[in-house]
């Protein structure tokens, strides 16, 4: 099989290849229509729909597709949608490059026994210049049709009035869904109002959220059209008359104004890319930004970080090398008897000292803690040699603070001639570290990276969860240190992007509530 051969080329060998071969062989399908079931038909091509392994195998199949691209031609792939593009000042140069690429794609498809339907393909010019002539670009001798707009991942790209075309397309979809919503909303036995609002948010307004990094370029007039769609849908969901003021409508529904939420989600998208660092698709292979933000987006992000009193340089990002395994250190969450909170504080203390004496007698002990109050968010760490106390950005959650405390302890309190025992009362941080995945918070990846660095100097690193406020003197000292922070203590400016997004969302909702409170409709 072609796919198995490609897997072997990629270095996927052994039993996994045999399993994949068995998984793909002798597959059949049947079609169910109402209560009838069709006959069995063998599947000769393709991958099973809905299978977890199918997307991975499809990526393996397309792994060498980039070799078909001529120099200067780029591509974007999502599932089986391929978007090939080229930019240059001369049209003849672009035509030649694209034609060469199409010929290479045809050879590649023939070699790997893959069929492409050229009649389903299209080509468009997205430059601001008027074309002197329409170049002829073919695939397998079939001329690719030129179109005014080209659709990729549900977004219409156009040379003229792109925002207007996108809005028109989304608006037509939204109106169809609003009409469908009316059929279930105007009934005494229909869904609850809360569920109808969720339908509006997740089915209608989400059409605008999906492409927020593009729709945030709308003009104010186009934004008003978006808001009209939202208020129309909410009136149907709430069963309120047309003359209900929009500000009252938003307050009752507990929703943000759609145009403001689009801008917020766009900002969150760009912040997330900053946090992903070199692993973000906006960076090229040389770790340099491959795209440039337009002026409006730059101003939006600058204003946001000014409002939050921080900068993009202080966002906790993915480490350059991602960690794909979770067994890089020992993590004890419920392995010892003292980790049972049902015990009394005095018993927990005695059991802890017994475990340390038996299991960690020669370890260098470090305890960390974090504190969050109306005045400060702080972290602290202590060992029998030294200690530290820092203020951190108040936006950071207590989860982020606890993780940063361990990171700082590894930097400042470690010794090179002993194994390390780190004590923390944050169960959630250790649980996240133990279950490390690509989707884990960035601060957990930062912590994992620091542990791996320290493992070069230590035989063992053990992290142990200790119940809080249980008279364990190490924890009590760290807790006291964290709570004694003042303005004079040094500031660590690191901030988690997850906390920025959470804070930004809170501020946005507060602005909606303030608008209502300052309106004439507030009693």
Model-inferred region functions:
Residues 1-10, 83-107, 162, 217, ...:
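Catalytic palm subdomain of template-directed nucleic-acid polymerases
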Residues 1-48, 86-87:
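Conserved pre-catalytic core of RNA-dependent polymerases
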Residues 7, 20, 31, 50, ...:
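Mobile genetic element proteins and their domesticated derivatives, centered on retroelements
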Residues 31-57, 85-91, 160, 182-193, ...:
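Short, conserved non-catalytic motifs in the polymerase core
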Residues 35, 100, 114-148:
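Short, conserved micro-motifs composed of acidic
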Residues 55-85:
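Active-site palm subdomain of RNA-directed nucleic acid polymerases
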Residues 128-131, 139, 186-190, 194, ...:
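RNase H-like, metal-dependent ribonuclease domains
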Residues 142-214:
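Basic, alpha-helical interaction scaffolds
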């Amino acid at each position: 099989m072609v796919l198995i051969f490609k897997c072997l080329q990629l270095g996927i060998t052994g039993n996994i290849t045999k399993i994949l071969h068995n998984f793909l062989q002798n597959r059949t399908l049947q079609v169910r229509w109402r209560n009838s079931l069709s006959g069995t038909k063998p599947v000769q091509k393709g991958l099973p729909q809905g299978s977890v392994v199918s997307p991975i195998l499809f990526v393996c199949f397309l792994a060498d597709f980039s070799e078909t691209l001529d120099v200067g031609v780029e591509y974007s792939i999502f599932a089986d949608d391929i978007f090939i593009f080229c930019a240059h000042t001369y049209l003849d140069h672009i035509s030649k490059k694209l034609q060469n690429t199409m010929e290479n794609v045809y050879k590649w498809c023939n070699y790997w026994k893959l069929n492409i339907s050229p009649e389903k393909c299209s080509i468009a010019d997205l430059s601001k210049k008027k074309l002197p002539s329409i170049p002829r670009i073919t695939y397998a001798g079939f001329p690719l049709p030129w179109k005014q707009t080209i659709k990729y991942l549900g977004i219409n790209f156009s040379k003229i009035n792109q925002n207007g075309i996108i809005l028109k397309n989304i608006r037509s979809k939204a109106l169809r869904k609003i009409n469908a919503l009316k059929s279930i909303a105007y009934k005494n036995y229909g869904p609850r109002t809360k569920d109808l609002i969720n339908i509006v948010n997740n089915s209608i307004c989400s059409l605008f959220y999906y492409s927020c990094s593009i729709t945030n370029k709308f003009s104010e007039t186009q934004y008003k059209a978006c808001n009209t769609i939202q208020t129309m849908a909410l009136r149907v969901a709430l069963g309120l008359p047309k003359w209900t003021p929009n500000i009252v409508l938003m307050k009752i529904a507990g929703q943000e104004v759609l145009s403001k939420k689009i801008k917020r989600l766009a900002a969150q998208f760009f912040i997330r890319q900053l946090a992903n660092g070199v692993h973000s698709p906006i960076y090229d292979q040389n770790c340099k930004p491959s795209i440039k933000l337009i002026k409006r987006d730059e101003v939006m992000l600058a204003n946001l970080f000014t409002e939050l009193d921080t900068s993009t340089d202080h966002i906790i990002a993915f480490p350059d090398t991602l960690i794909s395994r979770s067994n890089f250190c020992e993590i004890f969450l419920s392995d010892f008897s003292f980790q049972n909170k049902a015990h009394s504080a005095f018993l927990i203390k005695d059991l802890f000292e017994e475990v340390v004496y038996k299991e960690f007698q020669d370890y260098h002990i470090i305890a960390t803690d974090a504190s969050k109050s109306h005045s400060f968010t702080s972290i602290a760490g202590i060992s029998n040699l030294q200690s530290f106390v820092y203020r951190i950005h108040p936006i950071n959650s207590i989860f982020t603070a606890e993780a940063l405390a361990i990171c700082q302890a590894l930097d400042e309190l470690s010794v090179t001639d002993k194994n390390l025992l780190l004590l923390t009362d944050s169960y959630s941080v250790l649980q996240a570290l133990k279950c490390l995945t690509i989707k884990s918070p960035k601060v957990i990846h930062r912590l994992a990276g620091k542990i791996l660095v320290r493992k070069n100097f230590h035989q063992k690193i053990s992290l142990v969860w200790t119940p809080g406020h249980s008279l364990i003197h190490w924890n009590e000292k760290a807790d006291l240190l964290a709570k004694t922070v003042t303005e004079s203590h040094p500031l660590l400016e690191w901030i988690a992007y997850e906390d920025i997004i959470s804070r930004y969302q809170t501020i946005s909702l507060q602005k909606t509530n303030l608008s209502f409170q300052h309106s004439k409709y507030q009693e």
